[in-house]
Amino acid sequence: MSSPRPSTSSTSSDSGLSVDTTAYPEESKYTSTAPGAGGLSDENRYRDVEEGEAGADEPFLPSAKKQAASGSRTSRLIWGLVILCVAGWLWGLVLFVTQNRSAQQSVSEALQSHESGAISGSSSSGKPVTLEQVLTGQWLPRSHAVSWIAGPNGEDGLLVEQGEDQGKGYLRVDDIRSRKGDATSQESRVLMEKAIVQVDGRTIFPVSTWPSPNLNKVLLLSEREKNWRHSFTGKYWIFDVATQTAQPLDPSNPDGRVQLAIWSPTSDMVAFVRDNNLYLRKLSSKEVVPITKDGGADLFYGIPDWVYEEEVFSGNSVTWWSGDGKYVAFLRTNETAVPEFPVQYYLSRPSGKRPPPGLEDYPEVREIKYPKAGAPNPVVSLQFYDVEKQEVFSIEAPDNFEDDDRIIIEIVWGTEGKILVRATNRESDVLKVFLFDTKARTSKLVRVENVADIDGGWVEPTQYTWFIPADPSNGRPHDGYLDTVIHEGYEHLGYFTPLDNSEPILLTQGEWEVVDAPTAVDLRKGIVYFISTKESPTERHLYQVNLDGSNLKPLTDTSKPGYYDVSFSHGTGYALLSYRGPSIPWQAIVNTETDELKYEETIEDNAGLARMVDSYALPTEIYQNVTIDGFTLQVVERRPPHFNPAKKYPVLFYLYNGPRSQTVDRKFNIDFQSYVASSLGYIVVTVDGRGTGFSGRKTRCIVRGNLGYYEAYDQITTAKLWGEKPYVDETRMSIWGWSYGGFMTLKTLEQDAGQTFQYGMAVAPVTDWRHYDSIYTERYMHTPAHNPNGYDNTSITDMTALQQTVRFLVIHGASDDNVHIQNTLVLVDKLDLAGVQNYDLHFYPDSDHSINFHNAHRMVYERLSSWLVNAFNDEWHRIADPVPDDSMWEKVKRSLPMLVK
């Protein structure tokens, strides 16, 4: 498949950046050589050459009968031949060893060929980044999480700290002002003296802690076991601060494994889920009250099923307390009609159960309720529990979606029993906002957005809607809420007040977007804090704006590139401001009481990271943009240290490119791509093509219904632009990605058909979107019934095109519960039917989507690295069409290992 020419193609550079790195102050105790160096000798290059038959390399000797009949002349002739053969063998051995050393040397030189003689780029004479350092996290910046907590009487600036600290106790609440000797600060309060707790003679080792809102109790979790990406089970305990003692969450069943536990806002109750049923424990009693009773394999209460956990809430909870503690809202999920998909485990037993005797050699099979595109979805409904009446009830919503066409994406409690519910249709392109009144048990539809009609796009299932209570004395006569709205092609903040008003007050507007907004709201001042891309799609800065849309201004330094995130205290008077790049990351506590941020304390400066950066030869990052068909796309090029523009460099393209994702940003990051540039000496390019986020909805939504086409086109077009650069070897270009990036790698190779990219490496790829989960897929592709041609077009089907590449690699975890191994197996079958052989395949047993079972994660990256080196060393060219070689030289080489033994 040939790609059409772009209407316009241009590049422009907006800045250059050297270095980006991380981690621990101490120098690494690990060392690593480039994978394959010293191990890619000639005899290992041709893996398709079969070994000769036994005895084939032995010198010819006459039979014993002929020997007896011969004279001394014949005997001398024979001995002469033997001597000649031995001499020839010795000479061959010398040549072989010499050539072998030369081959190893040439590989080593190939890996280092771009490390010296540069006239631009990094001039550091330091060591290259090693793969060992990347895999063991030695380049990760140090960072701290601050757990802000509201005081029992609404005090601001309090935070929870955990860990032994000079006899101050294991778990404590500190006032941030006390660090500077502020006389108005609250006294530090110790919640837990020790990290280990005794309960009825048992020793408990908590792995997580949650203080109650009044700080009198602490909920403890022990013996945690992972379920899916976000969910887990464990044993829960209630710890009393005053007595420093603990009791089981459910005294009648202390060993029961709990899936979720949440404090009530009033600190006197805990709602929890066990065996998919919801329970209530009042601290005034040791009895546990069941809220639901019919939960089981197909019915979930208060926790999401697999697809809602993965694709909607990105968490393990769908339980929400009302602010006054009088009601609990929760989702009821019915999976009865959802088909099951079997995931096999060959070495491990995720269930924790031993197989029956005699069945130890059979794999454990976990049947997952997994709705693929077009299959029945779980039926999800909202229910409520009245704590005082001990009653479960539901409220009918007018003009609601049908059961099989409804996805509930957010629940937001207000005051006086009011609750906002955001839901979409199955294809996620119509949003409805409902207002429920739990006291009156009524509801109404207050807002509808048909996004399909607005721009042909979709609604992302985010949870950032913010309730704004009425405060007439402060200029807010009615309740309201903040939500993200589409305005002139970009996502901005809108303030809806009263709650049933469908037209917002626009707080932001322009050709930029807010990101996961709002971050915080100061109700006293009427100020909204948010992160946005106002300066550049690759940057994140902190801003504030008044609730009436006035006085929008940045709070971080926008005079230079920056990437920030922030965590505010309960009353918004303080915040943890985290600078993520492009320079060395740092974190500081700031005071927001004044018009400008006041820096109170730097809690991390990554000084050790700065020293580490000085010791290593890091890639230079060049941020640019390309314009393709009128769309401006962000690009970063990582150049090897000592970059020499007079040389010709191989180029690796790295991508993810999923809808609304972003890979090109200004965060400080040393990763596998950095290793490839620093140690292997290759250029690495990443372009966020159409479909990615934060450049406006026009750029994003064009891919809907035809995933892969425009994205691949943008990768190919950008690669062609790079191929024209004088320092790029256009005959050595590869592309790689994981998950959606794996799909995009194969789609790009398919669309390119060997014209631009010679190689590709795809990890855990989707190969047919009919095999992926319904909620994610249909959001971007519609249903298969609605868009059959789109599903056909976006699948990897053109094996002839893939055959035009030199070679490609596919890797998959055999127990991937997310992107099922079915995707790769179906692709392999298509390759077999087409007679395509120019690929390598590697499966990792018992590994999920992250591929980390046993030593798999390390092996993935070592395989990627060595495979790429072989590709750019032209090894895959040499094995493309193997033929038998019966020359004496090949026989000698094959016989050497046996002779050495």
From Swiss-Prot:
Cytoplasmic side of membrane: 1-76
Membrane-topology descriptor: Single-pass type II membrane protein
Disulfide bonds: none
Annotated glycosylation sites: 334, 625, 793
Compositionally biased spans, kind Low complexity: 1-22
UniProt topological domain (Vacuolar) ranges: 98-901
Chemical reaction(s) catalysed: Release of an N-terminal dipeptide, Xaa-Yaa-|-Zaa-, from a polypeptide, preferentially when Yaa is Pro, provided Zaa is neither Pro nor hydroxyproline
Region annotation Disordered: where it falls in the sequence: 1-67
Keywords: Aminopeptidase, Glycoprotein, Hydrolase, Membrane, Protease, Serine protease, Signal-anchor, Transmembrane, Transmembrane helix, Vacuole
GO cellular component: fungal-type vacuole membrane; plasma membrane
Transmembrane segments: 77-97
Major location (coarse): membrane
GO molecular function, one term: serine-type peptidase activity
Keyword Glycoprotein: yes
Gene Ontology terms describing biological process: proteolysis
Domain of life: Eukaryota
UniProt-annotated location(s): Vacuole membrane
Purpose of the protein: Type IV dipeptidyl-peptidase which removes N-terminal dipeptides sequentially from polypeptides having unsubstituted N-termini provided that the penultimate residue is proline.
Family indicated by similarity: Belongs to the peptidase S9B family.
Name recorded for this polypeptide: Probable dipeptidyl-aminopeptidase B
Protein's organism: Aspergillus niger (strain ATCC MYA-4892 / CBS 513.88 / FGSC A1513)
Lineage: Eukaryota, Fungi, Dikarya, Ascomycota, Pezizomycotina
